[in-house]
């Protein structure tokens, strides 16, 4: 071991090893597939409590709600949602 060495393997040696690619050839696609399924099935919306894209606005709405008064914003949105 050279003076000042931390004893770790060089990065180039790691990424050129067969062991690295045997492990990562399975894990990287699996992580990608798991993320894709998590989002595409809608589980991400349920897990984090965010509304789904089709429930941001009511079906009768043609545009996004706009709050015109700073301090009455909540009451304006409540009134709009009751209609």
From Swiss-Prot:
Binding residues annotated for heme, in chain numbering: 24
InterPro entries reported in the protein's UniProt record: PSII_cyt_b559_asu (IPR006217), PSII_cyt_b559_asu_sf (IPR037025), PSII_cyt_b559_N (IPR013081), PSII_cytb559_asu_lum (IPR013082)
Membrane-protein topology: Single-pass membrane protein
Cofactor field: heme b
Compartments reported by the entry: Cellular thylakoid membrane
Listed Gene3D superfamilies: Photosystem II cytochrome b559, alpha subunit
Transmembrane annotation, as ranges: 22-36
GO biological process: photosynthetic electron transport chain
Keywords: Electron transport, Heme, Iron, Membrane, Metal-binding, Photosynthesis, Photosystem II, Thylakoid, Transmembrane, Transmembrane helix, Transport
Pfam families referenced in this protein's UniProt entry, alphabetically: Cytochrom_B559, Cytochrom_B559a
Keyword set includes Membrane: yes
One GO cellular component term: photosystem II
Cofactor, how bound (note): With its partner (PsbF) binds heme. PSII binds additional chlorophylls, carotenoids and specific lipids.
Molecular function as annotated in GO: electron transfer activity; heme binding; iron ion binding
Purpose of the protein: This b-type cytochrome is tightly associated with the reaction center of photosystem II (PSII). PSII is a light-driven water:plastoquinone oxidoreductase that uses light energy to abstract electrons from H(2)O, generating O(2) and a proton gradient subsequently used for ATP formation. It consists of a core antenna complex that captures photons, and an electron transfer chain that converts photonic excitation into a charge separation.
Similarity comment: Belongs to the PsbE/PsbF family.
Entries under HAMAP family matching the protein: PSII_PsbE (MF_00642)
Subunit-structure text: Heterodimer of an alpha subunit and a beta subunit. PSII is composed of 1 copy each of membrane proteins PsbA, PsbB, PsbC, PsbD, PsbE, PsbF, PsbH, PsbI, PsbJ, PsbK, PsbL, PsbM, PsbT, PsbX, PsbY, PsbZ, Psb30/Ycf12, peripheral proteins PsbO, CyanoQ (PsbQ), PsbU, PsbV and a large number of cofactors. It forms dimeric complexes.
Stated name of the protein: Cytochrome b559 subunit alpha
